[in-house]
Amino acid sequence: MSRLFLLGALLAASLQGTASASCPDFLNHSMRQLASTDTIQFCEAYEGKALLIVNTASYCGYTRQFEGLEQVHREYADQGLVVLGFSSDDFFQEDNDEGDAAEVCFEKYEVTFPVLATSPVRGSNANPVFKGLGDAAGYPRWNFNKYVVSSTGDIVGHFSSGAEPDSEELRAAIEAALPAASS
């Protein structure tokens, strides 16, 4: 009986190690969602998914890009893409009240993709996701920088604020990152 238990424990440990090994370090974190107590553990929630990660703000000239990001989210969700917004006040254009920031995202722009609670996205104080992205591909120089991460965890591209969600270059990177394309 104890041998069977030991075998089961070893099998469970090896499977757990495999799951965490396939998750890049920069995504192996949990963060709280905007204006919520709910958290997302990125590796568990988005294993095998491509990600479009964007640093967002409510009062920026690029805030209108929420519309295009929502369109990308709706267009590619069934193909394995998740758009993730990371609210940030690093450029002093995010509302200090999370409820008001959430109102901009979810009511004004009718965003349905996840947006995370306000956190730093650049420098030594960057949240762990943006620390990994920034170290590997460069930190955001403004709001609405976009990072495309493949379903295997590779950073496919980093796009500046000026790259519109419907740009050919961004769309090409997204399509290359989708699960069928990157496996």
Residue ranges and their predicted role:
Residues 55-59:
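Amphipathic alpha-helical repeat scaffolds
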Residues 15-30:
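N-proximal helix/coil linker or "cap" segments that precede and/or mark the start of modular domains
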